[in-house]
Amino acid sequence: MMRALGYPRHISMENFRTPNFGLVSEVLLWLVKRYEPQTDIPSDTETEQDRVFFIKAIAQFMATKAHIKLNTKKLYQADGYAVKELLKITSVLYNAMKTKGMEGSNVGEEDISKFKFDLGSKIADLKAARQLASEITAKGASLYDLLGKEVELRELRTEAIARPLEINETEKVMRIAIKDILAQVQKTKDLLNNVASDEANLEAKIEKRKLELERNRKRLQTLQSVRPAFMDEYEKVEEELQKQYDVYLEKFRNLAYLEQQLEDHHRMEQERFEEAENTLRLMQNKLKEEEKRLLKSGSNDDSDIDIQEDDESDSELEDRRLSKPRTAMEVLMQGRPSKRIVGTMQGGDSDEDEDSEDSEMNMEDDEEDDDDLEDESIALSPAKPSRRVRKPEPLDESDNDF
């Protein structure tokens, strides 16, 4: 800013790290000359009194001429705080210079837009002018009325001034005023006396409270120093409670672990059961396809088998059909996991039990597969009408294959 204003020297904040009154006085004189070149301010700052007088003169000049209030203490310190005070003056000069430059650059634009104006601002100015005109009219009317009454008022005023004062009435009024003043003084004295008495009472109460506080403090210290009789029992109960809590935590963790193991076991059993069902379904589909293929191949051959043998084979197939579904259902019911769980809290034999159960399930699944294959072959064999007689060789071949 100082460079923009035309100050010849370069100024930085490093110059004000330590008090530098010479630089501050030089800058102040230059700024004052910028405001008013004909001003006469003494520049002597050798002694302390001269510096104080210089700072006061600068502050008074800026307050009267530029309406800028400066802090004389901060200026006298001549450090970083003085820079803030100097900025108050330089900012005003810098803003004035900027506005002047902007006005010079906008002269051509003002000539071009001379007849252009802001309609909104003009309307606001018009409203303000109308309000002021109405106020001026009202004030003028009231002033005219008062001036019309001035003749009568002048006569009354002169009569009141010329009338002699009665001493008795004046003394009476003065005595009444003196009595009122004396009553107020007495009231004030009473209040002061009451304040003194109240102060004494408050001091007495404060002393009493202090004594009670000291007494209670000593009592508290004695109570803290004495060990209660029930403290030993309390500590024992607390230790026992802590032990019970530890046992509870251990059992709770074991229970949570066992519940998780049970859920895992149920999930594994469900997965095995679903896998067995899927394998059975696949085998059934495969058997159906094989039976269809065998039926198609057997239908092309001639029937040379005796009717009696056909009847015997039909009866045997009926017996096998009735016996096999019952055994398959028993195997499936044995293969399903029981919902009742019997055991101890120890988990040492869980792996062996799971292995044995897995082996039993595998054996039962194999038996179920064989029974289902036989059932499918038996159920599909008598599907054709009795008019055609089939040879036994395809059935034997299908049983031997599976």
UniProtKB/Swiss-Prot annotation:
The modification Phosphoserine is found at S303, S313, S315, S398. It comes from Rattus norvegicus. Interacts with CLU/clusterin. Interacts with UBXN10; the interaction is direct. Residues 301-317, 349-377 have a biased composition (Acidic residues). Keywords: Cell projection, Cilium, Cilium biogenesis/degradation, Coiled coil, Nucleus, Phosphoprotein. This is Clusterin-associated protein 1. Disulfide bonds: none annotated. Residues 292-402 are annotated as: Disordered. GO terms for biological process: axoneme assembly; cilium assembly; floor plate formation; heart looping; left/right pattern formation; neural tube closure; smoothened signaling pathway.
